[in-house]
UniProtKB/Swiss-Prot annotation:
Protein name: Apolipoprotein C-II
PANTHER family assigned: APOLIPOPROTEIN C-II
One MF annotation (Gene Ontology) recorded for this entry: phospholipase activator activity
Species name: Microtus ochrogaster (Prairie vole)
Region named Lipid binding: 66-74
Gene: APOC2
Function according to Swiss-Prot or TrEMBL: Component of chylomicrons, very low-density lipoproteins (VLDL), low-density lipoproteins (LDL), and high-density lipoproteins (HDL) in plasma. Plays an important role in lipoprotein metabolism as an activator of lipoprotein lipase.
């Protein structure tokens, strides 16, 4: 599973790198590329809004009170644990830096 994750991460980074390189070439070639960029941003924004609305509709259709309570309880417990561990880690770093 770790190799699949790394492969997926590599492919995502490769695609993003190609997109950035293509965007830079478009800006260098065409001074009116801001209009194209605006169209792409609007398109991505509309796709995102559509996906978000679909996810919210699906959530509302499958909403269960008991599951929601369990999720809230799990979130509060995990955030409390993370706060504790973060403060311990910070204390250890400060102790290491002070040299006590």
């Amino acid at each position: 599973m770790g190799s699949r994750f790394l492969l997926a991460l590599f492919l995502i980074l490769l695609v993003l790198g190609c997109e950035v390189q293509a965007a830079q070439q478009l800006q260098q070639d065409d001074p009116g590329s801001s209009a194209l960029l605006d169209k792409v941003q609007e398109s991505i924004s509309s796709y995102w809004d559509t996906a978000k609305a679909a996810a919210q509709d699906l959530y509302q259709k499958t909403y269960l009170t008991s599951v929601d309570e369990k999720l809230r309880d799990m979130y509060s417990k995990s955030s409390a644990a993370m706060t504790t561990y973060a403060s311990i880690f910070t204390d250890q770093i400060l102790t290491l830096l002070k040299g006590e």
